[in-house]
Amino acid sequence: MAKVLVLYYSAYGHIEKMAYAVAEGAKSAGAEVTVKRVPELVPEEVAKASYFKLDQEAPIATPDELAEYDAIIVGAGTRFGTVASQMRNFWDQTGGLWFSGKLVGKVGSVFTSSATQHGGQESTILGFIPTLLHHGMAVVGLPYAFAGQMGTEEVKGGSPYGASTITNGDGSRQPSEIELEAAKYQGAHVAKIAAKLVA
């Protein structure tokens, strides 16, 4: 049984919802799944004034524990076309894991969100993949076998690089059914590949 970590950062709860959908998918594929989040860097008074969702039940992860898992699925919103600084800061503390090769051969995958359709979802995922590759991880995306990412009948996130959701500038749009299904599919897909690698 593969051990899968869904590691996320969510300011307003959109990525949190996606993270639990990813976890559901991974569990459905037989994985042992843990959901954790990275620490908030914004001062609490600023976060409260900005209406951040601070009541998230997932425990805080530490960089060293990444080595305990067979697959790590990373989720964070885009900030100006790249990953949110909270997630970047967390991974910038993994030099010891890199030096000792603790993540080599593990599966890595990424999902994201943005305020608009063209707000940097693909650039965020593609910009984070080199971090996984530098750690020697095997990168897995969201294949077109998930047909939900095809078509133009509705506004939706998702690409072969990973699941994603669109939030609107005011955060009023929640992940749609098809976006959550994409997240579940990605979680299951990663878990199945990780299980083959650890068999």
Curated annotation (Swiss-Prot):
Which enzyme class? oxidoreductase
Superkingdom of the organism of origin:
Bacteria
GO MF, one annotated term: FMN binding
Binding sites annotated in the UniProt record for NAD(+): Y12
Q: What is its EC number?
A: 1.6.5.2
Q: Does the keyword DNA repair apply?
A: no
Q: How is the cofactor bound?
A: Binds 1 FMN per monomer.
Query: Which UniProt keywords are listed?
Result: Flavoprotein, FMN, NAD, NADP, Nucleotide-binding, Oxidoreductase
Reaction it catalyzes? a quinone + NADH + H(+) = a quinol + NAD(+); a quinone + NADPH + H(+) = a quinol + NADP(+)
Annotated signal peptide: none
- According to its record, what are the GO cellular component terms? membrane
Domain Flavodoxin-like stretches: 4-190
Entry binding sites for substrate: W98
**Similarity field:** Belongs to the WrbA family.
Listed PANTHER family:
FLAVODOXIN-RELATED PROTEIN WRBA-RELATED, FLAVOPROTEIN-LIKE PROTEIN YCP4-RELATED
Q: Which NCBIfam families match?
A: flav_wrbA, PRK03767.1
* Name used for this protein in its record: NAD(P)H dehydrogenase (quinone)
- From which organism does this entry originate? Rhizobium rhizogenes (strain K84 / ATCC BAA-868)
